[in-house]
Structures are given as structure tokens and as C-alpha cells.
Amino acid sequence: MSVQTSPSKQVTSGIQNLNMDSPAKKLDFGATDKENKPFDEDLAKLEAEIDAEHNANKKAAEAKKMAPTLKPEEANEPLLTENPQRFVLFPIKYHEIWQMYKKAEASFWTAEEIDLSKDLHDWNNRLNDDEKFFISHILAFFAASDGIVNENLVERFSGEVQIPEARCFYGFQIMMENIHSETYSLLIDTYIKEPSQRTYLFNAIDTIPCIRKKADWALRWITDKSSTFAQRLVAFAAVEGIFFSGAFASIFWLKKRGLMPGLTFSNELISRDEGLHTDFACLLFSHLNNRPSKQLIQEIIVDAVRIEQEFLTEALPCALLGMNADLMKQYIEFVADRLLVALGNEKIYRSTNPFDFMENISLGGKTNFFEKRVGDYQKAGVMNSTKKADADAEVAKNENGGDFTFDEDF
């Protein structure tokens, strides 16, 4: 009796007889045996690559402990050498620098707060052509200068200084310089109605030689690759402490005469801010270990004095406002002496303040003008967080180079 094969067995037998070889090329997994490699080996290889890249970056960072523009002698400057904590603000380590930032923050104001409604009447009816010429050119100088100060802060100082407390101040200073520039531009826009004259003033660095000369002096320090941070710090203290001083005084001269209330009020706010910026430069200078020689500091200041005196007595004579040129020279020397003392030098001019109307004007804002907020212009509560013991205040005072700060009354 024959055994009958079931249908299922027939199918199974047929499958076994099929030729499973394909004419196509077979995939060869055996060559690399990748599917059989333990996962840990791949992970170890990846970790090794990451470690190698990290070590390479670490070596590169070690080779750049200083910013490219810093000098070998600045390698031990805590303010300038690489600070791994620079991305985090707290805990505060430089309390006097932090207090300076909070003081600047409390003094915030905007261009919209300046009332220019009465200025146009004075401009059109109470000023002569010489006075208009002088004021318009002073405003043109200021409008350009604030941009130059910001150029230095953005391109050099903010990147070079490695401590977050100082970077906070510089960040706020940049904002305030923008507000100053906006204010001066707004003043020009308000007083000068002729479009071509406006363009001439807005482009003062290119169109007005005496302003270009002052701008070139400041710009040279920004681009100077051979000077140290300390030298440039002194130079820009001179820009804000000396280059602006005579112009501020000339506008306060208008206040004494009861002219241009909007201009003179903005001048008071801006002069206070610039005094604080100069104070801050002197404070940072006191934290440097390697400072320029007293002779070099004196040379920078004397050079700035010469340029400022020439600017306000020859190129754009203050006599146009009815001010005495010799007294203006003396006033610039008086301001320069105070800056020299703040930087740890001795006075060289020993000039007294020749302008009685400046006696009650403070670059720190301690005024008695109750009708405006300039005397106690502070945002509520901002300064409360900076209250320290008298000992801390004394330390900050000493580190400013003595008992002088630019917020003292003239």
C-alpha cells in the first residue's frame, strides 16, 4: 500500500528543493562584522574623539589666556586675564565697582524727558548769530563724540575687561551714551531748520576740521595696538573728563544768563553722567597692578589739555558766547589737575576754578534745582541694594586715588 503524501508535506518538500541562490551580489556582513561589535566599543570610540577635541580646545584656550590686544606685562591683571566666572554675576567680588554700576542705573533718564518748548523762542529771539554758531558746533561735537566713546567700549574695553561687575557698568554706559547722542541730535534737529546745515552738523567729523582733530585723537587710541589697556583707560578718561569740560562750561554759561532751559537741563544731566564715567575709569585704574608711569599719564593729560584749549579758544572760540578765552584755558587746566589727582599724579597746573557759575554745578549731580529731577534723579529703591558699611565707602574712596572724585562740587 502506497503512502499518500499530504498537501502540506508536498509544499514543504517543494520549498526545500527551491534554489535560494540569487544572481545578484550578496551583501557581505562578515567583512566588518559590524552588527556583532559590542555597543560599548562604538561608545568608547566616540568618547575618545570628544576627549581629543576637548583637549585641543583646552590647549588653545590656555594659549589665549589674554585677549589678543593685551601685552605680556598685563598677564597678571585680575581685571584682564581670562575669568571662567565672567558669565555669572553673583557672588559680587568687586563691591565698589558694582556700586558704581548701581549708581549709574539709578541715574537713568531719556531724551523724551527734556522740555525744549522754550528753547526755540530763545534761539530765534535772544541769541545772536555768533552764539548760534557756537552752540550748533558744540552740539555737533558732542553728537559725534558719544559715538566714538561707544566705539571704544564696544570694540575694546568691553571685550578686554573680564570681570562681570565692570561689564555691567560698560553695558549701561553704552546705553546712556546712546541717549546722550540721541539728545544732541534731537537738539540739532530742533534748532536747525535748514536741511543742508543739519547734514553739515551731523557729519561734523568729516565737515568741521576742529572737530575732526579731536575725534582723530580719540580714534587713534581705539586703533592703537601698541598701547596697554591702562594707557587707553587714561586716554578715554581724558576724553570724557577734559574734552567735554569746556563745552559743558560754555553751556552752563548760557544757564547763568537764563537762556535755553532745555539745552542747559540736558547739559546738566549729561555732565553728571560723564562725571560718573570718568570716576569709573579712575576706579578701574586703581585696580590695575601695572599702571603707566606718572610721566606717561601726565603726557596723555597734557596733550588732551592742549587740544581742548586750542579747540575752545582758537578753532571754536568761546568768545563767541562772550566768555573770556584766558579764563576758559584756566578752567580746563583746573579740571585736568583734578583728573591727574584722581589718577594718582600730582597737580601740574595748580589752577583755580575761574568760573563762579560752576561752583554749584557738580559733575555728580548734587544740585539744588528743585523744579527738575536732576538733583535726586534716582529710580526708587535702586540704590538701597548697594548700601554698605562706612568702611566699604572708605575703601572705594581710597581706591579712586585719594579723596577726590568727580562727583564733588566744583
From Swiss-Prot:
Comment on bound cofactor: Binds 2 iron ions per subunit.
Catalytic activity: a 2'-deoxyribonucleoside 5'-diphosphate + [thioredoxin]-disulfide + H2O = a ribonucleoside 5'-diphosphate + [thioredoxin]-dithiol
Alphabetical list of InterPro entries matching this protein: Ferritin-like_SF, RNR-like, RNR_small, RNR_small_AS, RNR_small_fam
Active site: Y184
Residues at which Fe cation 2 binds: E177, E240, E274, H277
Subunit note: Heterodimer of a large and a small subunit.
Name of the protein described by the UniProt record: Ribonucleoside-diphosphate reductase small chain
Source organism per UniProt: Neurospora crassa (strain ATCC 24698 / 74-OR23-1A / CBS 708.71 / DSM 1257 / FGSC 987)
Lineage: Eukaryota, Fungi, Dikarya, Ascomycota, Pezizomycotina
